[in-house]
Swiss-Prot record:
It comes from Nitrosospira multiformis (strain ATCC 25196 / NCIMB 11849 / C 71). PROSITE patterns: RADICAL_SAM (PS51918). This is Dual-specificity RNA methyltransferase RlmN. One of its GO terms (biological process) is tRNA methylation. Keywords: 4Fe-4S, Cytoplasm, Disulfide bond, Iron, Iron-sulfur, Metal-binding, Methyltransferase, rRNA processing, S-adenosyl-L-methionine, Transferase, tRNA processing. The keyword Iron applies. SUPFAM superfamilies: Radical SAM enzymes. The keyword rRNA processing applies. Its EC number is 2.1.1.192. GO terms for molecular function: 4 iron, 4 sulfur cluster binding; metal ion binding; rRNA (adenine(2503)-C2-)-methyltransferase activity; rRNA binding; tRNA (adenine(37)-C2)-methyltransferase activity; tRNA binding. It comes from the Bacteria. Reaction proceeds by a ping-pong mechanism involving intermediate methylation of a conserved cysteine residue. The gene is rlmN. [4Fe-4S] cluster binds at C111, C115, C118. Specifically methylates position 2 of adenine 2503 in 23S rRNA and position 2 of adenine 37 in tRNAs. m2A2503 modification seems to play a crucial role in the proofreading step occurring at the peptidyl transferase center and thus would serve to optimize ribosomal fidelity.
Amino acid sequence: MSINLLDFDAKGLTGFCAEIGEKPFRARQLLRWIHRTGEADFDAMSDLAKGLREKLAAAAVIEPPKVISDHTASDGTRKWLLSVGAGNGIETVYIPETSRGTLCISSQVGCALACAFCSTGRQGFNRNLTVAEIIGQLWWANKALTETFTSEAGRERPITNIVMMGMGEPLTNFENVVTSLDLMLDDNAYGLSRRRVTVSTSGIIPAMDRLRERCPVALAVSLHAPNDALRDQLVPINRKYPIRELLGACERYLQSAPRDFITFEYVMLDGVNDSVAQARELVQLVRDIPCKLNLIPFNPFPDSGFRRSSANAVSRFRDVLMEAGLVTTVRKTRGDDIAAACGQLAGKVLDKTRRVPRNIAEAAG
């Protein structure tokens, strides 16, 4: 069986080159061809000797997930549904802005954490994605977007930021996610800054500590509630890793973080977590931690049981936080007409936790 070179970071490619009798510098050449150029055909790698190209073709492949569908929203947001085999699909979303282009990447087929307000969590969990399936999302998107991208003010390439906020909990797929992060940061591959790569977690504390040691990038924490009683309901992993312990892990993470703050994400649910009293409680909870609050309007999906907070409720909540001196933003809703907004990604998941096939709408249109 051929080896998929998308599964390897620089260290892995160096080891592979040694196994086929090649010197370490060949790994750097391969990294540049595969990731910087987006080349999947060994014959097109013109600075590699013919003999090496033949060895590569005999032993290896460059095989990202296959694109099932590609939809663009009215606001320019683009969503790909990618096949990862056995009837499963994952979703990747590109959000263009004037000064940056952000790619939202999935880390699992489904998610086992079952957050109450998240479409992905409702579909159950099938498996972790491989490195090739994680980095392959960036590979595909970079290739597709580069074909039509023109230099814009403030950026010279289509993808400037990565957020691991797609399907799945990244920190329960730790090794594959970290290897993918290494590729994102590698100057011979994508060359992104640690400050521009963000991992979002629901609060897997041991893995947060490991990430701080192994590959500290920007961190976002899905908080969504100002106390344990409510967070236990909305984010069930809180029963294992309660808020006070989570905040302690955040403080430890800041010792190595590329940014001097943690982002706390807070989805706004009408009548659930959006009162002024809850805003004040949230202030008391996080005021001693260098942080930014990101308020996220809830994005509806069928049978969610939740409603989006009104604009007035969001404004009142934000004002309480800002008056207390907390940096607070309200996330713009992007791509909701193609189900690409936060909390809507669901792909196509064969749930192995409940053994029930779930076919989710791929996209509108």
